[in-house]
Amino acid sequence: IWSHKMRSFLTMLGIIIGIASIIAIVSTIKGTSEQIKEDLIGAGNNTVSVSLNYGDSDYDPEYGMTDGTEPPLLSDQQKEDVMNLDHVENATFFYSRTYTSSVYYENTSFQGGSIYGIDMNYLDTCGYMVRSGRGFIQKDYDEMRKVVLVDSNAADNLFAGKDPVGKTIEIGSEPFTVIGVVEQNDDYQPNIKTIDEYNQYYQMIMGTVMIPNKCWPMAFKFDEPENAVIRADSTDNMSSAGNAAAD
C-alpha cells in the first residue's frame, strides 16, 4: 500500500512539476514579448514617430536638401489620409528643431533641448497634460498668437524655479508669451541601446518648447517638412500603422 501511495505521489509530483515548467516557459515567452513591446512603444502610449530622411540621415532643416531641391511638404489631404488609415487612432504633424540656441529667457539660453511647432492634436496624441496655465486653443492658431508651452524640464532649465506662466521668451528674435507648462502622463523609462536613442533621451531631459505651427514661419522664416506621430489603436498594430503612414 505504501509503495502504491508513493508511486501515486511521485506521479502527481511529476505532473505538477511539468505543469509548473510549462507555465514558467509561457510566462518567460510572454515576458520577453512584453519587453519587446515595451521597448517599441517607449512611453507606453502606442505611438510611432515618422520623420523625413534624406539618404541614410534625418533631414536637417538648418541645411535643407543637399542636392538643392525643395523638401516635400505635406498637404492637408495627405494628413487627412493618414488620419483615416486602418488602426490609426490619432495623428499629429509638427515642425521640429534640436538647435535651440535662438531660444532665450532674459540672459538664459535654452541649450540642448527641442523646439516644436505643433498642431492641436499633438498634446493628446503624445500623452501630455497641462500642469499649470492652459494649453493651446483654436484662436491661438486662427489669430497666429505668439504664445508658447514649455514642458516641465524646459521650465526647470529656463526659469530656475520661477513660475514660467506669463513670462516672455525670445524665439528667433520674436517674443512669445508662456501660457502653460505641460508634462507627459506616463513616466518614460528609456531602454537606451544606440547613440541616437541617447541623443533623443538627452534632448528630452533638457526639455521641449512648443509653439503653434502657424507661428513657425515667424520664428524660422520659412516652411519646413513636418514630422508625424501616429497613435495606433493597439501595440500589436503599431508597426502596420507606422508603415502605412510612412508610405
Model-derived segments and spans:
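Phosphate-coordinating loops and pocket residues in cytosolic domains that bind phosphorylated ligands
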Residues: 3, 42, 84, 160, ...
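Mid-to-C-terminal secondary-structure elements
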Residues: 121-135, 146-246
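N-terminal Sec/SRP start-transfer signal
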Residues: 1-19
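Juxtamembrane alpha-helical signal-transduction segment immediately C-terminal to a transmembrane helix
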Residues: 11, 15, 25-28, 36
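Hydrophobic, regular-secondary-structure patches
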Residues: 30-114, 121-124, 139, 157, ...
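Residues that line or immediately flank small-molecule/substrate-binding pockets and catalytic motifs
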Residues: 13, 95, 171
